């Protein structure tokens, strides 16, 4: 069983990060193009494995915690869905069979808890090396 104090500390930390990022102009997308960091791609990919269509709240939380604009998050998910569909079509055409590809169950508008997003960020393999 998880220590409730650790959960409360994680929520408090996520809240402080959200407050800080809300005051940044970079959150509003006023800066130029920036490449996504490894940790941003890692977290976005893990969320994409859970749901290809995250809810508005999930996109907002990701944007704040990853220091990206909500629109950038939305575009990333659109592009990832497109790549995923292309890979599925390519796989079906390689099989050369007229069989119908099994449809994946799509979970739409799933809200991923902030605790899980924070845990993903903190559990990133080289998180301990960030800032060194």
UniProtKB/Swiss-Prot annotation:
Transmembrane segments: none annotated. GO terms for molecular function: DNA-binding transcription factor activity, RNA polymerase II-specific; RNA polymerase II cis-regulatory region sequence-specific DNA binding. Its main location: nucleus. SMART domains: HOX (SM00389). GO terms for cellular component: nucleus. Residues 29-88 bind DNA. It comes from the Eukaryota. PANTHER family: HOMEOBOX DOMAIN-CONTAINING PROTEIN, HOMEOBOX PROTEIN HHEX. This is Homeobox protein HD-4. The lineage of its organism: Eukaryota, Fungi, Fungi incertae sedis, Microsporidia, Unikaryonidae.
């Amino acid at each position: 069983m998880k220590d409730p104090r650790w959960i409360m500390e994680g929520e408090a930390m996520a809240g402080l990060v959200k407050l800080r990022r809300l005051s940044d102009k970079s959150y509003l997308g006023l800066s130029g193009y920036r490449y996504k960091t490894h940790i941003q791609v890692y977290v976005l990919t893990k969320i994409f494995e859970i749901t290809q269509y995250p809810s508005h709240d999930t996109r907002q939380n990701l944007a704040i915690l990853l220091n990206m604009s909500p629109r950038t998050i939305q575009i990333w998910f659109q592009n990832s869905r497109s790549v995923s569909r292309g890979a599925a079509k390519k796989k079906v055409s390689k099989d050369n069979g007229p069989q119908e590809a099994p449809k994946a169950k799509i979970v739409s508008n799933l809200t991923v808890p902030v605790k899980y997003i924070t845990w993903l960020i903190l559990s990133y393999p080289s998180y301990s090396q960030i800032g060194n």
